[in-house]
Curated annotation (Swiss-Prot):
Pathway: Glycan metabolism; pectin degradation; 2-dehydro-3-deoxy-D-gluconate from pectin: step 4/5. It comes from the Bacteria. It is an enzyme of class 5 (isomerase). One of its GO terms (biological process) is pectin catabolic process. Its EC number is 5.3.1.17. Its cofactor is Zn(2+). Belongs to the KduI family. InterPro entries: KduI, KduI/IolB_isomerase, KduI_N, RmlC-like_jellyroll, RmlC_Cupin_sf. Binds 1 zinc ion per subunit. This is 4-deoxy-L-threo-5-hexosulose-uronate ketol-isomerase.
Length: 278
């Protein structure tokens, strides 16, 4: 488990490229036949990926010990979106087939969660966010047909995109975790611009569906002290509440967003005009 401490905005603005990477960048999300796990002190979110190929993968009791509990989800809820080939997730003996861009919400208290790929030639890639939970909501599969989509932006401003809301109150109940997938229309490059912060929630972006020769310049920092982190395919970035989170790519791309914090009101954000950015 890679533990990331919270960081004050005054400290963050003094960091060089490597310093920003050390604090915010999750460079390697998928490793064959393993799980990756980054634990952030910011709202106690856990972020990672699971890519089973030749064997099943489960999160063992060693993680429970690191969290001070008996097992991983004793006091946590889990959201998973599959960006790879078809796979299965078995939760306490109940098997769910999770296809490409299907998702699974796993409620607090699930003791055994096992991940597998159906075809080793096209393995599943399970990206997950995990957050503290106060009660148990039912485990539920969500397919792309069941999400709450919203299309925003315009081709003229190169920010036309569809926001697919997977884990939001309109789709299912969770304790605090919200997740979704945003896909840019062909030829569009900007996400979340004009940008915003949200004092009451933190957020993690996971960028994928990018060519090897493409990248995204992820904008972060306070609106008057912006910085950037260069993101490559299948990398994630942590965004504290005080930071903007926006990006521009050399080509169109897709990203998964996950939020935890005070509320689940999607529009609870503090907008920042482009003219006010520095």
């Amino acid at each position: 488990m890679d533990v990331r401490q919270s960081i004050h905005s005054a400290h963050a603005k003094t960091l060089d490229t490597q310093g920003l990477h050390n604090e915010f960048l999750v460079e390697k999300v998928f490793v064959a036949d393993e799980y990756t796990m980054v634990y952030s002190h910011i709202d106690r979110i856990i972020v990672g990926g699971i890519m089973p190929i030749t064997k099943t993968v489960s999160v063992g009791g060693e993680v429970g010990k690191q969290l001070g509990v008996s097992y991983f989800l004793e006091r946590r809820e889990l959201g998973v979106i599959n960006i790879g080939g078809a796979g299965t997730i078995t939760v306490d003996g109940q098997c769910y087939e999770i296809g490409h861009r299907d998702a699974l919400y796993v409620g607090k208290g699930a003791k055994e969660v096992v991940f597998a790929s159906i075809d080793t030639a096209t393995p599943a890639k399970f990206y997950y966010n995990c957050a503290p939970a106060h009660t148990t909501y039912p485990t539920k599969k969500v397919t792309p047909d069941e999400v709450s989509p919203v299309t925003l932006g315009d081709n003229l401003t190169s920010n036309r995109r569809t926001i697919n809301k997977y884990f939001v109150p309109d789709v299912l109940e969770t304790c605090q975790l919200s997740m979704g997938l945003t896909e840019l229309a062909p030829g569009n490059l900007w996400n979340t611009m004009p940008c915003h912060t949200h004092e009451r929630r933190m957020e993690v972006y996971f960028y994928f569906n990018m060519d090897d020769d493409a990248c995204v310049f992820h904008m972060m920092g306070q609106p008057q002290e912006t910085r950037h982190i260069v993101m490559h395919n299948e990398q994630a970035v942590i965004s504290p509440s005080w930071s903007i989170h926006s990006g521009v790519g050399t080509k169109a791309y897709t990203f998964i967003w996950g939020m935890v914090g005070e509320n689940q009101v999607f529009d609870d954000m503090d907008h920042v005009a482009v003219k006010d950015l520095r």
